[in-house]
Amino acid sequence: MNIPRFLTRFTPNLLYKYTSKIFRKYLTRTNAPKRSKQIYKLSENMSEVKTQHYLSLLGTGPVDNESLSFFSSHPCGLPYLTDPSPYQPVPFTPLYEKNDTSDTFFNQTLNTAGTIPHALALIRRDILELNPRLQERESDSAPSLEPDFVLLVKIDTCLNGFQGTVHGGLLASLLDESLGCCVEALSSCLDLVHQRHPGERARLYTANLNISYRAPLTSPGAVTIKTWLKRREGRKWFLEGTLSGDDGRVRTEVKGLWISERSKTVL
């Protein structure tokens, strides 16, 4: 292979510095999307967040008013934001600042005008009122309820795989986060019902995600993600969800399993 003569004057370290400088200049000249809005905090005193139940944070944390306004006039938001509605808008916590490096994929990388300019979470009011009706889900034959947790997302064009098509990995991430928010809310609801201290809560971990891609999702556009807890068996939480496009057609389906950690026995 013929190496350009000017490159032979560089040592490996100098070559690395030279090429890195070129790439940095290139990246700063590209039209990288800027953040379209501020990054909210769940609380002015972030030290208090770790001492609160997740459901309490949803009930008291600030909702993104720009996203609320956007979806209040968008067809996908009308079923959930028009009175009487069984849903209440709540913070989509992955987009909120945590004063550490957690959730930076959502609250920094995806929190731009060209990626996800708007996102709004909604939860059933009966869950916030500590009446999650879990006894109705003890078997697969139980009647289906309205979604426990709904996420409305506006997706722009900087998250494409194929031209004009949203990357499937982004859809998987949105479904994973939505199911995670759903199970955290329901688990927190039970903790509050049984008057458990936040420090006593068992952590929940994703054990399995089975995603089926039914049809491509074009961009830009808005999506509706609906999630349900189907049943619970001991430490296992079985959830399902769907992701639909602007036209209401289901593009992606998911089934997930979350497992809570074993309780720690104090000796």
Language-model region placement:
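Terminal targeting signals and extreme-terminal segments of soluble enzymes
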Residues: N2-S219, R232-L267
